[in-house]
């Protein structure tokens, strides 16, 4: 398994994986309400999610005990982006990312990631176009370096429609208990919807690799989104051939007084 993405049978969920080469798909043509990958009624899908999470929890303990592999889960969506701080801008764009990569035995989740630097930076012109262009190759090399050091990478784009995003933002305003989630920046970024879709399209084309694939997950239905991600994570962990480390000799003879 060292140095490459594990061989995983994702079954029908393979439809959401962006091929590593010659992707002819268009993000704007993909249905954010699609449910063909796991065509179950909601109760069955939620039961499957609960089962997958329980199995992930079990395997996470073995992952930690074995302390050989790490799993990095990258989540990106169509919400407001956090612009880099002046301190972050003073370093190379991967500086803050590398130090947050999970250690062996750990699972790390990036809620937003190094892809901000080819998304928000591109849309808002924070750096020259030639620097954006260079970053795609830099990201691929960085991710390859991680994989060669036993960090398995899963990247999920949570694909919702513009109409669904509007409904969710409005729901936050309408419900006093959800207003704390509202970010005015979401409204400003929403005006750049088409620009972001174009930036994501390029990122998928340039940075979905055999060693660090992108999955475009239909996310209009949160329960379906959760089911897909849980199943992909579970299937990936199962493919890592996780085992507990060998026990010390003579443990069966030890008696605790």
PLM feature spans:
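Pre-Walker A adenine-sensing motif
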Residues: 57-65
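Glycine-rich phosphate-binding P-loop
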Residues: 73-83
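Conserved catalytic network of the ASCE P-loop NTPase/AAA+ motor domain
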Residues: 64-66, 86-87, 99-103, 145-151, ...
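NTP-dependent small-molecule kinase module
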Residues: 198-201, 205-257
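Charged, amphipathic alpha-helical linker segments immediately N-terminal to NTP-binding catalytic cores
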Residues: 1-55, 68
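Conserved nucleotide-sensing/catalytic segment adjacent to the nucleotide-binding pocket
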Residues: 37-48, 85-137
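A glycine- and Lys/Arg-enriched "phosphate-lid" helix/loop adjacent to the NTP-binding pocket
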Residues: 120-138, 146-198, 246-252, 256
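Pre-Walker A (Motif I) flank of P-loop NTPase domains
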Residues: 67-72, 104-105, 212-213
